[in-house]
């Protein structure tokens, strides 16, 4: 395979639901990070051959969010752009598609990434189109319906995490301990400025002033497992609980028995947040790196995708990561750092068991439970965070980024530091 380089990458700080970024459109967030990533790379917009950007909650945003991002970033009209829709994998899928474009010889430089403003997702009134003549009509929350709902089984993503709890025997205590650790790691990382290099300030209006939003606002300080153990379960267990009937697409080796099997164990504290943010990544061929004198951060050496039963969508990273590592010619023992998106503590624990993660290498600065999960951006965000952390660690040579995808899928990439 030809060499594929990640020239530069950055992200916005992540906003809370209804927080600092609620009034900043997704296309604006994307335009800000793309403009900045080109600036950081010392590149001109006209050097870009194509832009691919993930975004899930596109209702009411206008045609082709990626094209809007491209134009807002100052990329010429002559450069095509398209929006990638693979639910939570969209931002990472854009990187995979960018790599394929370069390998196919269609492009030399592709800007990839993702953007999402979950706070701004509108409500829809489907009946209004053809017949809401009188009486009450049902409104649809497009944020939940298009981003967080399993259409195959008609329940929330949180219920798929409860299915994983039942099959893998994951206790409430394990999940709360995992979630508290994520928050504690992020609290320490923010205090040490570990995220500063990867974050691009976003101008936001506060009353009459314009201020820079540049610190993730979702993390909580002083979180303990004992403290969050008081919260109630947030999602109903599936009708099949405590023994959900699923089709396994890989051999399960990490299943255990749990004394609280069949109970509600997923809470607001051990699940990821509902958030806003964007991330951008520049991919380039070896020829483009030489031609323009670019200084890459990392190589993209492998990627993979996989499918699982939608009822247990959270374990999608298992086949995806195995495929990515096989393509890269590495094993989990060769991986120095892992960014595994924390959609739920339940699925994160199951994935770690199945892949044999050394947890001291995983989400060393916390993950989506603490930082948040702007769904269309997260796949790119974890790559950005992974690479920036690798650059801070001389011993970190190779990294794995992976995440689960609603509908029963996963994506993963393997990178090597330059």
PLM feature spans:
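N-terminal extracellular/periplasmic Venus flytrap/periplasmic-binding protein-like
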Residues: 10-12, 22-32, 40, 174-286, ...
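Active-site pocket-shaping loop/turn-to-helix segments
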Residues: 12-39, 57-59, 82-99, 119, ...
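Beta-strand segments within the central parallel beta-sheet cores of soluble alpha/beta enzyme folds
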Residues: 46-54, 80-85, 110-115, 176-181, ...
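Conserved catalytic cysteine-centered active-site region
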Residues: 55-110, 152-159, 222, 226-273, ...
């Amino acid at each position: 395979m030809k060499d594929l380089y990640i020239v530069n990458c950055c992200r916005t700080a992540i906003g809370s639901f209804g927080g600092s970024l609620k009034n900043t459109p997704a296309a604006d967030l994307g335009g800000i990070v793309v403009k900045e990533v080109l600036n950081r790379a010392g590149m001109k917009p006209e050097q870009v051959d194509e832009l691919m950007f993930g975004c899930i909650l596109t209702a009411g945003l206008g045609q082709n969010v990626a094209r809007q991002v491209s134009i807002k970033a100052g990329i010429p009209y002559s450069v095509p752009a398209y929006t990638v829709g693979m639910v939570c994998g969209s931002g990472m899928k854009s990187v995979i598609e960018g790599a394929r474009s370069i390998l196919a010889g269609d492009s030399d430089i592709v800007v990839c990434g993702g953007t999402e403003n979950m706070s701004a997702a509108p409500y829809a009134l489907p009946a209004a189109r053809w017949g809401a003549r009188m009486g009450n009509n049902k409104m649809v929350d497009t944020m939940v319906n298009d981003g967080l709902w399993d259409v195959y089984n008609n329940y929330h993503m949180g219920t798929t995490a409860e299915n994983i709890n039942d099959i893998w025997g994951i206790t409430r205590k394990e999940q709360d301990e995992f979630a508290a650790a994520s928050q504690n790691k992020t609290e320490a990382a923010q205090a040490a400025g570990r995220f500063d290099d990867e974050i691009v300030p976003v101008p936001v209006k506060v009353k009459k002033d314009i201020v820079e939003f540049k610190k993730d606002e979702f993390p909580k300080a002083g979180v303990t497992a004992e403290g969050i153990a008081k919260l109630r379960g947030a999602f109903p267990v599936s009708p099949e609980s405590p023994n959900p009937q699923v089709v396994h697409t890989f051999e399960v080796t990490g299943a255990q028995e749990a004394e609280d099997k069949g109970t509600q164990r997923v809470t607001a504290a051990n699940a990821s947040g509902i958030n806003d943010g964007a991330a951008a990544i520049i991919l380039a061929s070896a020829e483009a790196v030489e031609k323009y004198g670019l200084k890459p951060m990392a190589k993209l050496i492998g990627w993979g995708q996989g499918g699982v039963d939608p009822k247990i969508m959270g374990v999608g990273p298992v086949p995806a990561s195995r495929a990515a590592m096989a393509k890269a010619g590495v094993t989990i023992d060769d991986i120095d750092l892992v960014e595994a998106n924390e959609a739920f503590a339940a699925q994160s624990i199951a994935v770690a068991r199945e892949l044999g993660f050394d947890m001291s290498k995983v989400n060393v600065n916390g993950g989506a439970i603490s930082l948040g999960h702007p769904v269309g951006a997260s796949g790119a965000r974890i790559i950005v965070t992974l690479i920036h952390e690798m650059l801070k660690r001389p011993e970190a040579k190779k990294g794995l980024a992976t995440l689960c995808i609603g509908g029963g899928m996963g994506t993963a990439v393997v990178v090597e530091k330059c």
